[in-house]
């Protein structure tokens, strides 16, 4: 009878409702499992690419935020270690404590870095000078490049300093920690903006400021104790600090390359065992995961180059390459500078190309290499004297082709070399570029495995040698052979045959 209640019908209803509820729970579980990061917990090295979120990579935008919050940056508390002897004793006790308490000392991370609290005329005043004059696009270098964009691509001093002095709660790097007592430090960071002062100050006031900075730095007890060997000095543009840097040649220089021709650095001033190569700040935007998936199948230009076609010193190879390649099918060679229009043209060209030409300029390096990497365009490096950033960590053979200058200018050789490249090899290198891009993007906050992080991982390998030379200099007696004769300076000549496979 309709509507009549029976125990059997009630049990069927309960069973039906149970099955529906169970199905909903099972569906929800499977959905959550499918989106869980644990489901595809592949090792990070197998990930095809990465994406930046809530990170600022623009120097201008990051600087505006930095200066707007300048009062929140914690200054270095005064460390009253004005007596070199007392500082040396304090360092000894600190190092002995670490030796017996840390089984990995002195190779362990994080590195302990003391950041000097220099007078504002060496730091904040120069940053404000850049910000207040940035809109003046008429300020050009002798070759027509906008000065402020040139400063931007050498702004490694800003990115490192901004991260070091940020509140610890805002920092993401575990490779370095800031200490506020000099005797606790492995290294000392000198936050003087040498490139901004060189390009934005008149010649004589700039030289005067360099002399003041030199005196301030070399008067520090920690500098006198080590002769500057454990001090980090950012001189990323080859002209910066040039008039006085012979007096600080023992310090660790942060450089764009190591020109061995003598045009930029004097013999004995720079070498790999002492100094560190840092990448330029890219001039173009990152081609992220979505961009790469859209552009890689459509890269129909074989080889692309946009830049100055005539350069001095090692860059003379450019004019020879123009003669060889300019009319070739599938090749785009354009004259251009790094202005806003130039940035857009270079970015579009690189994202349409499989290979990007990266020849030497006035110096062995240029920002173009890093523009190509973040654009997903395989660099073709023709710069026989080039030294590369973080090469103790990164294997550039996986993302770039190295061609000797002699081979590159042989009629037809370079085009045949590129056209004979197997599609599978090209695809593999493009995938590797997607993984490597993160290592060349300066950002705020600084990211793990970004260039700021790799700086300190590379520095960790120098600490033992720095301590060796510091202690050796402290105990060498007068009249002894006080010059080290164990420098290893192997010539750096590109051998195309060794990298074809």
Language model features: what each stretch is:
Residues 345-441:
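Catalytic binding pocket for nucleotide-activated donors in carbohydrate/polymer assembly enzymes
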Residues 2-340, 346, 351, 431-434, ...:
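Juxtamembrane luminal stem/stalk of type II transmembrane Golgi/ER carbohydrate-processing enzymes
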């Amino acid at each position: 009878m309709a509507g009549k209640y029976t125990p059997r019908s009630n049990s069927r209803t309960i069973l039906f409702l149970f099955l529906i509820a169970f199905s909903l729970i099972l569906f929800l579980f499977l959905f959550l499992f499918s989106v869980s990061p644990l489901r595809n917990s592949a090792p990070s090295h197998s990930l095809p690419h990465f994406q930046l979120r809530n990170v600022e990579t623009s120097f201008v935008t990051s600087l505006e935020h930095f200066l707007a919050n300048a009062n929140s940056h914690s200054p270095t508390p005064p460390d009253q270690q004005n007596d070199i002897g007392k500082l040396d004793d304090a360092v000894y006790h600190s190092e002995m404590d670490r030796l017996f308490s840390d089984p990995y000392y002195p190779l362990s991370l994080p590195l302990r870095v003391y950041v000097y609290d220099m007078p504002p005329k060496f730091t904040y005043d120069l940053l404000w000078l850049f910000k207040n004059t940035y809109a003046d696009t008429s300020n050009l270098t002798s070759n027509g490049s906008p000065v402020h964009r040139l400063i931007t691509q050498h702004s490694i001093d800003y990115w490192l300093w901004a991260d070091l002095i940020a509140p610890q709660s805002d920092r993401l790097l575990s490779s370095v920690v800031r200490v506020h007592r000099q005797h606790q430090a492995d290294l000392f960071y000198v936050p003087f903006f040498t490139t901004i002062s060189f390009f934005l100050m008149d010649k004589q006031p700039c030289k005067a400021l360099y002399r003041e900075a030199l005196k301030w730095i070399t008067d520090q007890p920690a500098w006198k104790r080590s002769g500057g060997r454990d001090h980090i000095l950012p001189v990323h543009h080859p002209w910066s600090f040039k008039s006085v840097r012979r007096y600080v040649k023992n310090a660790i220089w942060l450089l764009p390359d190591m020109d061995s021709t003598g045009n930029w650095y004097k013999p004995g001033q720079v070498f790999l065992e002492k100094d560190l190569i840092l990448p330029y700040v890219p001039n173009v935007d990152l081609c992220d995961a979505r961009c790469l998936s859209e552009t890689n199948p459509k890269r129909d230009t074989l080889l692309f180059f946009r830049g100055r076609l005539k350069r001095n010193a090692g860059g003379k190879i450019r004019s020879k390459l123009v003669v060889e390649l300019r009319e070739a099918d599938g090749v785009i060679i354009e004259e251009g500078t790094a202005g806003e229009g130039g940035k857009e043209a270079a970015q579009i060209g690189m994202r349409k190309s499989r290979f990007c030409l990266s020849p030497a300029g006035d110096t062995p390096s240029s920002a173009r290499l890093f523009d190509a990497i973040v654009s997903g365009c395989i660099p073709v490096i023709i710069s026989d004297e080039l030294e590369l950033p973080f090469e103790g960590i990164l294997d550039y053979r996986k993302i770039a082709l190295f061609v000797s200058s002699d081979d590159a200018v042989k009629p037809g050789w370079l085009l045949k070399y590129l056209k004979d490249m197997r599609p599978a090899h090209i695809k593999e290198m493009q995938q590797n570029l997607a993984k490597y891009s993160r290592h060349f993007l300066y950002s705020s906050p600084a990211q793990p495995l970004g260039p700021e992080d790799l700086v300190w991982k590379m520095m960790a390998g120098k600490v033992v040698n720095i301590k060796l030379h510091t202690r050796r200099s402290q105990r060498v007696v007068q009249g002894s052979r006080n010059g080290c004769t164990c420098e290893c300076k192997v010539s750096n000549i590109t051998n195309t045959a060794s990298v074809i496979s």
